[in-house]
Design a protein with these regions (language model features):
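Short, proline-enriched alpha-helix->beta-strand connector loops that line the catalytic pocket
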Residues: 130-135
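Extracytoplasmic/secretory ectodomains and luminal regions
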Residues: 37, 124-125
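Alpha-helical structural motif
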Residues: 23, 122-123
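Cap/lid segment of the alpha/beta-hydrolase catalytic domain
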Residues: 1-53, 58-60, 97-108
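Conserved strand-to-loop "acid loop" that flanks and positions the catalytic carboxylate
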Residues: 137-143
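Primarily recognizes the serine-hydrolase "nucleophile elbow" in alpha/beta-hydrolase
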Residues: 46-120, 126-129
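Glycine-centered flexibility sites
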Residues: 1-5, 66-71, 139
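Short, charged/polar "capping" segments at the starts of alpha-helices
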Residues: 97-98, 143-148
Length: 149
Protein backbone atom coordinates (compact mmCIF):
# COMPACT_ATOMS: atom_id res chain seq x y z
CA UNK A 1 0.00 0.00 0.00
CA UNK A 2 0.83 3.64 0.13
CA UNK A 3 0.72 5.80 3.22
CA UNK A 4 -1.06 4.05 6.10
CA UNK A 5 -1.50 0.84 4.10
CA UNK A 6 2.21 0.58 3.30
CA UNK A 7 3.80 -2.75 4.22
CA UNK A 8 5.88 -3.01 7.34
CA UNK A 9 9.58 -2.47 6.81
CA UNK A 10 11.96 -4.78 8.55
CA UNK A 11 15.72 -5.02 8.77
CA UNK A 12 16.16 -7.60 6.01
CA UNK A 13 18.29 -6.57 3.06
CA UNK A 14 15.75 -7.71 0.47
CA UNK A 15 13.33 -4.92 1.52
CA UNK A 16 15.85 -2.41 0.18
CA UNK A 17 15.51 -3.91 -3.30
CA UNK A 18 11.99 -5.35 -3.44
CA UNK A 19 10.28 -2.78 -1.23
CA UNK A 20 8.04 -3.01 1.82
CA UNK A 21 5.05 -4.25 -0.22
CA UNK A 22 6.67 -7.42 -1.57
CA UNK A 23 4.44 -9.63 0.57
CA UNK A 24 1.34 -7.92 -0.83
CA UNK A 25 2.72 -8.37 -4.36
CA UNK A 26 3.13 -12.11 -3.87
CA UNK A 27 -0.31 -12.45 -2.29
CA UNK A 28 -1.89 -10.74 -5.31
CA UNK A 29 0.22 -12.90 -7.65
CA UNK A 30 -0.94 -16.09 -5.95
CA UNK A 31 -4.52 -14.89 -6.44
CA UNK A 32 -3.85 -14.43 -10.16
CA UNK A 33 -3.65 -10.64 -10.06
CA UNK A 34 -0.94 -8.05 -10.30
CA UNK A 35 -0.51 -5.74 -7.33
CA UNK A 36 -0.51 -2.87 -9.80
CA UNK A 37 -4.03 -3.88 -10.90
CA UNK A 38 -5.20 -3.70 -7.29
CA UNK A 39 -3.89 -0.14 -7.08
CA UNK A 40 -5.40 0.80 -10.44
CA UNK A 41 -8.82 -0.43 -9.33
CA UNK A 42 -8.56 1.61 -6.12
CA UNK A 43 -7.72 4.75 -8.11
CA UNK A 44 -10.61 4.15 -10.52
CA UNK A 45 -13.03 3.59 -7.63
CA UNK A 46 -11.95 6.86 -6.02
CA UNK A 47 -12.14 8.69 -9.34
CA UNK A 48 -15.66 7.40 -9.99
CA UNK A 49 -16.76 8.38 -6.50
CA UNK A 50 -15.37 11.89 -6.88
CA UNK A 51 -16.86 12.28 -10.36
CA UNK A 52 -20.30 11.42 -8.97
CA UNK A 53 -19.91 13.32 -5.72
CA UNK A 54 -22.31 16.23 -5.22
CA UNK A 55 -24.79 15.03 -7.86
CA UNK A 56 -22.12 14.72 -10.53
CA UNK A 57 -20.93 18.33 -10.41
CA UNK A 58 -17.32 17.12 -10.37
CA UNK A 59 -17.71 14.91 -13.45
CA UNK A 60 -14.79 15.52 -15.79
CA UNK A 61 -13.05 17.76 -13.27
CA UNK A 62 -11.10 15.18 -11.26
CA UNK A 63 -7.35 15.73 -11.62
CA UNK A 64 -5.16 12.69 -11.04
CA UNK A 65 -1.61 12.89 -9.67
CA UNK A 66 0.76 9.94 -9.36
CA UNK A 67 3.90 10.73 -7.41
CA UNK A 68 6.71 8.22 -6.99
CA UNK A 69 5.60 4.61 -6.80
CA UNK A 70 1.95 5.65 -7.36
CA UNK A 71 2.82 6.86 -10.87
CA UNK A 72 2.41 3.65 -12.91
CA UNK A 73 -0.96 2.89 -11.30
CA UNK A 74 -2.19 6.44 -11.94
CA UNK A 75 -0.98 6.25 -15.54
CA UNK A 76 -2.86 3.00 -16.14
CA UNK A 77 -6.03 4.37 -14.55
CA UNK A 78 -5.93 7.46 -16.78
CA UNK A 79 -5.30 5.31 -19.87
CA UNK A 80 -8.11 2.88 -19.02
CA UNK A 81 -10.72 5.57 -18.35
CA UNK A 82 -9.45 8.79 -19.94
CA UNK A 83 -12.86 10.47 -19.68
CA UNK A 84 -12.87 10.08 -15.91
CA UNK A 85 -9.94 12.42 -15.30
CA UNK A 86 -9.46 16.01 -16.45
CA UNK A 87 -5.68 15.65 -16.30
CA UNK A 88 -2.81 13.42 -15.20
CA UNK A 89 0.33 14.64 -13.44
CA UNK A 90 3.17 12.12 -13.00
CA UNK A 91 6.12 13.16 -10.86
CA UNK A 92 9.25 11.14 -10.02
CA UNK A 93 7.55 8.10 -11.54
CA UNK A 94 9.17 5.14 -13.29
CA UNK A 95 9.91 6.09 -16.91
CA UNK A 96 9.93 2.63 -18.55
CA UNK A 97 9.42 -0.98 -17.54
CA UNK A 98 11.97 -1.98 -20.18
CA UNK A 99 14.62 -0.17 -18.11
CA UNK A 100 13.77 -2.37 -15.11
CA UNK A 101 14.34 -5.50 -17.18
CA UNK A 102 17.74 -4.24 -18.34
CA UNK A 103 18.90 -2.92 -14.95
CA UNK A 104 21.13 -5.22 -12.91
CA UNK A 105 19.82 -3.60 -9.70
CA UNK A 106 16.55 -1.81 -9.12
CA UNK A 107 14.69 -0.50 -6.09
CA UNK A 108 11.06 -1.16 -5.16
CA UNK A 109 9.93 -2.12 -8.68
CA UNK A 110 8.42 -5.52 -7.87
CA UNK A 111 5.03 -3.96 -7.10
CA UNK A 112 4.98 -2.33 -10.56
CA UNK A 113 5.31 -5.65 -12.42
CA UNK A 114 2.55 -6.91 -14.71
CA UNK A 115 3.21 -10.39 -16.07
CA UNK A 116 3.74 -10.30 -19.86
CA UNK A 117 2.94 -6.60 -20.28
CA UNK A 118 6.15 -5.78 -22.17
CA UNK A 119 5.07 -8.08 -24.96
CA UNK A 120 2.33 -5.55 -25.70
CA UNK A 121 3.24 -2.13 -24.29
CA UNK A 122 5.55 -0.09 -22.08
CA UNK A 123 4.74 2.91 -19.88
CA UNK A 124 5.62 5.55 -22.54
CA UNK A 125 3.02 3.93 -24.82
CA UNK A 126 0.34 4.73 -22.25
CA UNK A 127 1.50 8.34 -21.96
CA UNK A 128 1.43 8.64 -25.76
CA UNK A 129 -2.13 7.26 -25.84
CA UNK A 130 -3.38 10.20 -23.76
CA UNK A 131 -4.00 13.66 -25.23
CA UNK A 132 -0.77 15.68 -24.99
CA UNK A 133 -2.49 18.51 -23.13
CA UNK A 134 -3.91 16.07 -20.58
CA UNK A 135 -0.74 14.28 -19.38
CA UNK A 136 2.25 15.89 -17.71
CA UNK A 137 5.40 13.90 -16.83
CA UNK A 138 7.86 15.62 -14.50
CA UNK A 139 11.24 14.22 -13.41
CA UNK A 140 10.78 10.59 -14.56
CA UNK A 141 12.97 8.08 -12.75
CA UNK A 142 15.09 5.07 -13.60
CA UNK A 143 14.70 1.66 -11.89
CA UNK A 144 16.85 2.81 -8.96
CA UNK A 145 14.63 5.84 -8.35
CA UNK A 146 17.18 8.31 -9.75
CA UNK A 147 16.44 10.80 -12.55
CA UNK A 148 15.98 8.98 -15.88
CA UNK A 149 18.30 9.78 -18.75
Amino acid sequence: GIGRTRGKSDDSKWVEFFGPNANEFFLAYLLGRSYLAVRIEAILACGRFLANYAQGRLAGRVRLAGIGEAGPAALHAAALEPGLFASLHLERSLARWSDVVRAPIHRNQLIQAVHGALRIYDLPDLVAALPADKAQVVEPTDPAGKPAK
